[in-house]
A protein has these predicted regions:
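Right-handed parallel beta-helix
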Residues: 80, 85-89, 121-132, 143-156, ...
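Beta-strand repeat architectures
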Residues: 49-56, 74-76
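Right-handed parallel beta-helix/beta-spiral solenoid domain characteristic of secreted/periplasmic
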Residues: 33, 38-40, 59-62, 67-68, ...
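Acidic, glycine- and Ser/Thr-rich low-complexity intrinsically disordered tracts
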Residues: 56-59, 99-102, 188, 193-200, ...
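Extracellular beta-strand/beta-solenoid scaffold signature
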Residues: 70, 98-116, 132-138, 154-163, ...
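Secretory targeting and sorting signals
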Residues: 1-31
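Short acidic active-site motifs
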Residues: 44-48
Length: 350
């Protein structure tokens, strides 16, 4: 081959490679490389979280990790970031350490959390425990994250909180107990959204609702020792699912109007196939309230089993008349024993 021909072949080959790379950049995504990062100390865990990238699996050795632990990187649907460990791997925050990544223009702090996800999507949190913190696990502006098989206990306030428009997340196969040890009225087991009084901090825009929508809570054991509601569904949230959970109301304090397993103030939740037991201190099993006009409506209760020792109802819907055509529904498949007022205060359907 003549030198001029060799040059033509080389130029053509380079051009072909360049076109291939350009095509990959335009229409393809490179697969993330899975890294397994083993950690055994608080310093190692902080470093792994700071360097996290899609596909990482951060594995906790047994032991106690004390400090402010938070994730700010996002995984992807194909390559989530995983934080995993045995129940004997315990995250705590005894010195009220802070995630410094706070949003500008809002008067909020992120201090004292056992674990915090902060604008970090597509995570998996599995297996480990959280104890001795102000709050257990908090998700702020997080989507498509799964919390699976974790254990939260012994915290000052709420156990697990989906907040600041955290959507499409799942809490499953986990346990939450002994919450509200510092502030019983704020010791919810699972907290979805924010009260209207906190929308300026955690809502969408100026005083807009906290749209922590379409979150699922399934197959968990919540209680005993949960001082406030076992699940608090806040006004402004929509279309969540609460299914297949076991509730033990022993320890509900009555502080800050906490007198039921679930307090539903959002819209269009499916609340089904849950089993609850409660002592005489629990007024009702489930309550529906309207804190904001048009909310506390369209919630459907089906297949729930309630065992109570109280003067109230299994399912008490307090503001049905304010819901217009988007009525709450209590199906005939719900059952109750021990509630002196019966199954529900509204008509049972089906």
């Amino acid at each position: 081959m003549k030198p001029s021909q060799k040059r033509k072949v080389l130029v053509a080959a380079v051009a072909a490679v360049g076109l291939g790379l350009a095509g990959a950049g335009a229409g393809m995504s490179w697969a993330a490389t899975t890294r397994t990062v083993k950690v055994g100390s608080a310093a190692q865990l902080k470093a792994a979280l700071a360097a996290a990238r899609p596909g990482d699996v951060i594995t906790l050795a047994a032991g106690t990790y004390d400090g402010a632990f938070f994730g700010t990187a996002s995984g992807t649907a194909a390559a989530p970031i995983t934080l995993t460990g045995p129940k004997t791997a315990i995250l705590s925050n005894t010195k009220n350490g802070c995630d410094p990544n706070v949003p500008s223009g809002r008067s909020v702090t992120y201090c004292g959390f056992g674990f915090h996800l902060n604008k970090a999507n597509f995570w998996k949190l599995t297996g480990f425990s959280v104890k001795s913190a102000n709050k257990g696990i908090v998700l702020d502006t997080v989507t498509h994250t799964v919390i699976d098989g974790v254990a939260v206990s012994g915290v000052r306030d709420e156990g697990i909180h989906f907040r600041t428009s955290s959507t499409d997340n799942v809490l499953r196969n986990s346990s939450v107990r002994d919450t509200g040890q510092g502030q019983p009225g704020f010791g919810e087991g699972v907290y979805i959204g924010s009260a209207k009084s906190n929308w300026a901090k955690f809502g969408s825009g100026a005083n807009g609702a906290d749209h922590s929508d379409r979150d699922t809570v399934t197959g968990n054991r919540i209680g005993p020792g949960v001082a406030a509601e076992l699940i608090d569904i806040k006004e402004g949230t929509l279309n969540g699912t609460i299914t297949g959970n076991t509730f033990d109301g022993t320890g509900v304090s009555g502080a800050n109007s906490a007198d039921s397993w679930i307090d539903a103030k959002g819209n269009n939740y499916k609340i089904n196939s849950n089993k609850g037991t409660g002592p005489s201190g629990d007024l009702d099993g489930y309550q529906v309230h309207q804190q904001v006009a048009s909310f506390g409506c369209g919630n459907v209760f089906s297949g729930n089993t309630s065992k109570l020792s109280s003067a109230g109802f299994a399912i008490n819907v307090t503001d049905q008349s304010k819901c217009g055509t988007n009525l709450n529904v209590v199906g005939a498949g719900n059952t109750v024993t021990g509630a002196k007022s019966g199954l529900s205060n509204i008509k049972v359907t089906g």
